[in-house]
């Protein structure tokens, strides 16, 4: 190919192409196709300009080379082929004298007749694809684009071809000749296939086969293939683009990009009001389990059988009393509901054969607690659209709540280790490939760090409760079914253990849509006295139902046992996600993996073993008012898992909004820390968007308080 180029092109063009490749550090002995492409492009630019002049009247004329005429001015200024510094000098000079807008990229020519810069393209592919790439890269309506192909096709901005038919035909003929000459030497196929879209300096990673098809399928709308998208991304200029878009929107909008300095950000304002309350679907750190070890009773594994067996392990039941009423509820109904559960469990035990499921009698207290007949009657819109005062019922704004320390305590507890194992090591077949070996090694190390974690208990508890509730909602739609809240684990010694946390009673559940609500009453055992933090238990009615003997350093002590009762609701879509809470393990494992990968790429070897076994090393876990908290790799695993689990337990629109908006501020602060001199506009609007998500959700308020700690330390 190199020999062909030297024979086929004018020596001046070859010399300019050599210079250009040298400037970009490319070897023409290796990049022979690129060498040919640069020469072709240069020749087309020169042919475009050749013989075109402007006469004294300012008209464009064509003068053949033998016509000596010194008074004529060249119609086109050639920018292509000059070294970069000189080329920009020419561009700046043209802009200063003609008032043309300065282009972001070096164009190829300037047309003095039409007063516009021109970008010339020569492509071995389809002209419209290459045209799009050029347009996406340049993003300027002022620069005119003209694309030629080796097949005689052309495409230009607004179909304005600038030159006369004959001049363009000369260029097309020359390109066709080059193609034939290459083909006769067996060089054309390689040259045609080597075009990589809008050229950038760095090497492209070629994608082929299935990955190529998948890449083309997963593009945003309006992009036909990965090259188009790459060209668009390569030429993307965020600041100019934002300012330009805003000025298009309205003449009044003026986006001034302000520098973002250490003194710029202020803390996020947390709302004032009464303290926030517990809103998870089941108790977390305050739950109490009635457990049986090595269960082998008849019907073991059937929830109702397991629950009755667990209930029999406790002998301290007493007459229940309300110790913390629910402010807005009818508390005697909650009391009667618990008594009814006890009675109906007694009735089951006296039966000859215990049933697999238990439907509660539809008593007045349960009907009240489950909101039976409380929903307003639904009327078809067509039947009432003529009603003159038809309106949607008013809904009150949610009351603002302030941050409360109990949610930080909940999170700390979720990161702790328990004395039980909550997940088994998945038994997966022999590793076949080295990468599988590394993956299973990482999974095993990670599992060992989190299998005892309380957050893992919450996962298994959540999966069980949501699965049982969704099953019952579909199988017994009209029944008030009693659903035991159960989990299974192993002791440190490896003995199996079944735990009962309490019960759920499900209301009517004709769930047609994903968001249709099923009401339920939850009744959960606890040793936590609700009077210590009454604000946390605002939505609960708490009963004292027994006394439990506990072993302590000073012997056995008796502690009151409480029952936390509340009405709650969930939907098919929420239960579906609750059933998939095991995904939290995967998410946190992937976060740990990216840390290992970063370490491995620095050391140029797999660092999995060192990562988990080097106990002396500490890692950043989070930020507290005292500064950056650090801990062992196990603590990092458990903290990441707890965050993922709490995102699932406390999922809400407030969390979605806060996460999305605060992330923007986080990225700006990180850019500042990395000395990237970030600029912003409408920072006040961003703070507004963040703060409108801070209403009453405890997990969102905790995240906001963490974010403020991060801001304080990041900007010191």
UniProtKB/Swiss-Prot annotation:
The gene is PA. Binds 2 manganese ions per subunit. A motif (Nuclear localization signal 1 (NLS1)) lies at residues 124-139. A motif (Nuclear localization signal 2 (NLS2)) lies at residues 184-247. InterPro entries: INFV_PA, PA/PA-X, PA/PA-X_sf. Its EC number is 3.1.-.-. Phosphorylated on serines and threonines by host kinases, including human casein kinase II. This is Polymerase acidic protein. It comes from Influenza A virus (strain A/USA:Texas/UR06-0195/2007 H1N1). Signal peptide: none annotated. Plays an essential role in viral RNA transcription and replication by forming the heterotrimeric polymerase complex together with PB1 and PB2 subunits. The complex transcribes viral mRNAs by using a unique mechanism called cap-snatching. It consists in the hijacking and cleavage of host capped pre-mRNAs. These short capped RNAs are then used as primers for viral mRNAs. The PB2 subunit is responsible for the binding of the 5' cap of cellular pre-mRNAs which are subsequently cleaved after 10-13 nucleotides by the PA subunit that carries the endonuclease activity.
């Amino acid at each position: 190919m190199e020999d062909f180029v030297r024979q086929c092109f004018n020596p001046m063009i070859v010399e300019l192409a050599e210079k250009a490749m040298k400037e970009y550090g490319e070897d023409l002995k290796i990049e022979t196709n690129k060498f040919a492409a640069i020469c072709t492009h240069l020749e087309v630019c020169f042919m475009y300009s050749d013989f075109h002049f402007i006469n004294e009247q300012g008209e464009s004329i064509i003068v053949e080379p033998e016509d000596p005429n010194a008074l004529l001015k060249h119609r086109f200024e050639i920018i292509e082929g000059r070294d970069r510094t000189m080329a920009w000098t020419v561009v700046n000079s043209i802009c200063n004298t003609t008032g043309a807008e300065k282009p972001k990229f070096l164009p190829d020519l300037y047309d003095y007749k039409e007063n516009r810069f021109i970008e010339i393209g020569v492509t071995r592919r389809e002209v419209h694809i290459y045209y799009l790439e050029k347009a996406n890269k340049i993003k300027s309506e002022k620069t005119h684009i003209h694309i030629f192909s080796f097949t005689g096709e052309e495409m230009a901005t607004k179909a304005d071809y600038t030159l006369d038919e004959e001049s363009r035909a000369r260029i097309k003929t020359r390109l066709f000749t080059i193609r034939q000459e290459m083909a006769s030497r067996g060089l054309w196929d390689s040259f045609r296939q080597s075009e990589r879209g809008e050229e950038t300096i760095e090497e492209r990673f070629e994608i082929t086969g299935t990955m190529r098809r998948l890449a083309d399928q997963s593009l945003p709308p309006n992009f036909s293939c990965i090259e188009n998208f790459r060209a668009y991304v390569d030429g993307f200029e965020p600041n100019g683009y934002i300012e330009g878009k805003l000025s298009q929107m309205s003449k009044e909008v003026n986006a001034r990009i302000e520098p973002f300095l250490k003194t710029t950000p202020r803390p996020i304002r947390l709302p004032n009001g009464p303290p926030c309350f517990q809103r998870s679907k089941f108790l977390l750190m305050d739950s109490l389990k009635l457990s049986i070890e090595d269960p082998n009773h008849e019907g073991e594994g059937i929830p109702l059988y397991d629950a009755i067996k667990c209930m029999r392990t406790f002998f301290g039941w007493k007459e229940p009393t309300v110790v913390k009423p629910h402010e807005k509820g009818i508390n005697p109904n909650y009391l009667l509901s618990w008594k009814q559960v006890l009675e109906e469990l007694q009735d089951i035990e006296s039966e000859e054969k215990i049933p697999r499921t238990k439907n509660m009698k539809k008593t007045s207290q349960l009907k009240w607690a489950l909101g039976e007949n409380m929903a307003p009657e639904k009327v078809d819109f067509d039947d009432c659209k003529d009603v003159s005062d038809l309106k949607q019922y008013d809904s009150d704004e949610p009351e603002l709540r302030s941050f409360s320390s109990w949610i930080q305590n909940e999170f700390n507890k979720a990161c702790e280790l328990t004395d039980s194992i909550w997940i088994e090591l998945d038994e997966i077949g022999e590793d076949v490939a080295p990468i599988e070996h590394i993956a299973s090694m990482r999974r095993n190390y990670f599992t060992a760090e989190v299998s005892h974690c309380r957050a893992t208990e919450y996962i298994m508890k959540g999966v069980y409760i949501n699965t049982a509730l969704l099953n019952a909602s579909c199988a017994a739609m009209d029944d008030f079914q009693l659903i035991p809240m159960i989990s299974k684990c192993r002791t440190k010694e490896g003995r199996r253990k079944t735990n009962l946390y309490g019960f759920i009673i499900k209301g009517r559940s004709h769930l047609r849509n994903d968001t249709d609500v099923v009401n339920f009453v939850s009744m959960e055992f606890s040793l936590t006295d609700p009077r210590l933090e009454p604000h946390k238990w605002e939505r609960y009615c708490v009963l004292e139902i027994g006394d439990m003997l506990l072993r302590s350093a000073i012997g056995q002590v008796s502690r009151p046992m409480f029952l936390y009762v509340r009405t709650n609701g969930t939907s098919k879509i929420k239960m579906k996600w609750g059933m998939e809470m095991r995904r939290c393990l995967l998410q946190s494992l992937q976060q740990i993996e990216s840390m290992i990968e970063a370490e491995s790429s620095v050391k140029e070897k797999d660092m999995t073993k060192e990562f988990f076994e080097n106990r002396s090393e500490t890692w950043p876990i989070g930020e507290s008012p005292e500064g950056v908290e650090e801990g062992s790799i196990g603590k990092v695993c458990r903290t990441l898992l707890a965050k993922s689990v709490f995102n699932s337990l406390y999922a809400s629109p407030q969390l979605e909004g806060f996460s999305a908006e605060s992330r923007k501020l986080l990225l700006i602060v990180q850019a500042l820390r990395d000395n990237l001199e970030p600029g912003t506009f409408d920072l006040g609007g961003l703070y507004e968007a963040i703060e409108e998500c801070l209403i009453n959700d405890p997990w969102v308020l905790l995240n906001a308080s963490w974010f403020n700690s991060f801001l304080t330390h990041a900007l010191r």
